């Protein structure tokens, strides 16, 4: 019974680590509708596209 509990605990720890890493990675990008500048460095848009028209100082993130 102790082996089942320790392997379940290990699985839970790994699962928590993976979920927290994915949350950190996704937090490093700008969500759609938020302001962005494609000519500056990170963070970049999560969608990979910063819509900006001529004359605008900043654009906003959106899907293509």
Curated annotation (Swiss-Prot):
InterPro entries the record matches: Antimicrobial_C6_CS, Gurmarin/antifun_pep, Gurmarin/antimicrobial_peptd
Annotated localization: Secreted
Coiled-coil segments: none
GO cellular component, one term: extracellular region
S-S bridge residues: 29-46, 36-50, 45-61
Keyword match GTP-binding: no
Signal peptide: 1-26
GO BP terms in the entry: defense response to bacterium; defense response to fungus; killing of cells of another organism
Keyword check for Repeat: no
UniProt keyword terms in alphabetical order: Antibiotic, Antimicrobial, Disulfide bond, Fungicide, Knottin, Plant defense, Secreted, Signal
Chief place of localization: secreted
PROSITE patterns: PLANT_C6_AMP (PS60011)
Record note on domains: The presence of a 'disulfide through disulfide knot' structurally defines this protein as a knottin.
Function: Possesses antifungal and antibacterial activity.
Family (UniProt): Belongs to the AMP family.
Protein name, per record: Antimicrobial peptide 1
């Amino acid at each position: 019974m102790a082996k089942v509990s320790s392997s379940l605990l290990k699985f839970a720890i790994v699962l928590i680590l993976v979920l927290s890493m994915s949350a950190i990675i996704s937090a490093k990008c700008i969500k759609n509708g938020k302001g962005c500048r494609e000519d500056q460095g990170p963070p970049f848009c999560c969608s990979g596209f910063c819509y900006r028209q001529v004359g605008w100082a900043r654009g906003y993130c959106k899907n293509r």
